[in-house]
């Protein structure tokens, strides 16, 4: 006779997580969209991603296909993605996106620095000299004066552009 408070070993309670069919479909669509993003990447960038050989081959095929064949191949890529762990792939994709936004932000900072250099003059040039000791102080002063004159006389902003190019070169060489 079984006791009331005890359960049989085969009746152990497990936490069962039920996933609705709609939620499963949405997950599959997300994987397919991730696959579409991978198809849009250049082969040199794609080589850096942690992908299985089958998935890499399917992505290369999809890059060659057109229209309906490409649509079917994208669905196949979505199916292959179900067997992959999407997190490392998503992280690598986010890193690429973030790199572009960081570069854009850096260029915006350089533009602001250039504008301040033209408006405020020597004080900002000194800031630049501290940050980039290899910079030519005299050249910056000369270009800042020239940019002010060009702006006042409504001439093309040649010095304005040249200051930005010098700052950009200094910024890019700083990373090396």
UniProtKB/Swiss-Prot annotation:
One of its GO terms (molecular function) is ribosome binding. Keywords: Cytoplasm, Ribosome biogenesis, RNA-binding, rRNA-binding. It comes from the Bacteria. InterPro entries: DarP (IPR006839), DarP_sf (IPR023153). One of its GO terms (biological process) is assembly of large subunit precursor of preribosome. Transmembrane segments: none annotated. GO terms for cellular component: cytosol. It is found in: Cytoplasm. Belongs to the DarP family. Member of a network of 50S ribosomal subunit biogenesis factors which assembles along the 30S-50S interface, preventing incorrect 23S rRNA structures from forming. Promotes peptidyl transferase center (PTC) maturation. This is Dual-action ribosomal maturation protein DarP. The lineage of its organism: Bacteria, Pseudomonadati, Pseudomonadota, Gammaproteobacteria, Vibrionales.
